């Protein structure tokens, strides 16, 4: 930590010439173009150096010592510093994160400092932005257990929901995210000073909500799930969020939970979410397959491509549409036969079953 003196140009006492390109490019000096004046960005603030994961200083954060605004001020984004891709305290916390088996994300630098002073050195802070998808990627590389601690007021809950939304596309099976909300009158700094390390960690481990629980709690808030309208509203709001999740197991379980909440079969839910097409049973047809056929070069080329696609992805059979004017012979008849066989069952057969079915036929 350090201190930026009060005054407009304290850096001029240290750096000459003042200003210079390095000071302006790294954001330490601001140019007022209207008055053509230069002045220091950080004035009368406690200073926190921000390091990258290699320990190099890439920016600064400053906290006021009085009631001035903004309370926290960060270096602007520069070629070296991107707030959405860096976390305060990560370099210093890396060993403690490994030892604890978890990483804690808070909102302010002073929270990180206070927690470390009271024996919780595995905390990091976002840099004046909401937690981004890039932050989530970084956090998941550090630990399988990621805890977020937010103030219990409306602003804290809004920040928590933004963090959850940005986390959804990055989620991986085997990684767990948890959300702890402190009493409205506390932030992590004041809470640990009032209650100590043991009570803070007890709350962190036993009172935090896993992402899956917080997700449904937040989406269901204010909805009457005893009514069809409430259930449909939940479906509408949950669907685009669930679509962002690429973690197979977690995504499946969350959709299963949605089916339970709205009281429908998971298979029907999959259709509602647009993930499956209802099976279409088609009566088997028999097409003539003469050994000598009139050739239709363009259609035959397309038919051959579609046959290869069906053998690789049988579920695509529902998309096969042959115009009425096409003569069903040769490759087009083969395509029609294969598509009808695939659609005749409740689930698409694999390509081995397709080969076996047509083994001794002209198809």
Language-model region placement:
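Conserved alpha/beta enzyme-core scaffolds, especially Rossmann-like or related mixed alpha/beta domains
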Residues: 1-5
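Phosphate-handling DNA/RNA-contact segment within nucleic-acid enzymes
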Residues: 7-142, 146, 159-160
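A charged alpha-helical hairpin associated with nucleic-acid processing machineries
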Residues: 52-53, 94-103, 130-146, 150-363
């Amino acid at each position: 930590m350090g201190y930026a003196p009060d005054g407009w140009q304290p850096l001029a006492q240290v750096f000459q010439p003042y200003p210079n390109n390095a000071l302006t490019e790294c954001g330490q000096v601001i140019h007022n173009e209207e008055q053509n004046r230069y002045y220091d960005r950080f004035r009368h603030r406690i200073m926190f150096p921000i390091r990258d994961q290699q320990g190099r200083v890439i920016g600064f954060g400053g906290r006021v010592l009085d009631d001035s605004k903004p309370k926290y001020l960060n270096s602007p984004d520069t070629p070296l510093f991107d707030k959405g891709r860096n976390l305060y305290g990560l370099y210093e916390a890396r060993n403690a994160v490994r030892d604890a088996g978890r990483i804690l994300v808070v909102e302010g630098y002073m929270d990180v400092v206070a927690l470390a002073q009271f024996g919780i050195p595995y905390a990091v802070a976002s840099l004046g932005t909401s937690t981004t998808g890039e932050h989530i990627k970084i956090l998941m590389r550090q630990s399988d257990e990621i805890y977020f601690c937010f103030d219990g007021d409306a602003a804290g809950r809004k920040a928590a929901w933004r963090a959850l939304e940005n986390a959804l596309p990055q989620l991986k099976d085997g990684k767990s995210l948890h959300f702890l909300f402190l009493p409205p009158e506390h932030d992590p700094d004041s809470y640990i000073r009032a209650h100590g390390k043991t009570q803070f960690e007890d709350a962190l481990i036993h009172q935090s909500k896993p992402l899956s629980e917080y997700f449904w709690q937040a989406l269901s808030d204010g909805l009457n799930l005893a009514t069809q309208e409430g259930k449909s509203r939940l479906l509408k709001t949950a669907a685009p969020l669930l679509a962002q999740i690429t973690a197979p197991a977690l995504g499946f379980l969350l959709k299963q939970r949605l089916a339970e909440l709205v009281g429908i079969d998971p298979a029907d839910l999959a259709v509602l979410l647009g993930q499956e097409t209802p099976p279409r049973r088609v009566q088997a047809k028999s097409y003539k397959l003469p050994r000598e056929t009139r050739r239709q070069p363009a259609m035959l080329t397309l038919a051959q491509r579609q046959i290869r696609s069906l053998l690789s992805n049988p579920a695509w059979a529902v998309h096969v549409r042959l115009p009425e004017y096409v003569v069903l012979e040769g490759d087009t008849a083969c395509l029609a036969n294969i598509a009808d066989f695939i659609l005749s069952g409740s689930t698409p057969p694999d390509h081995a079953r397709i080969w076996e079915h047509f083994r001794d036929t002209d198809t």
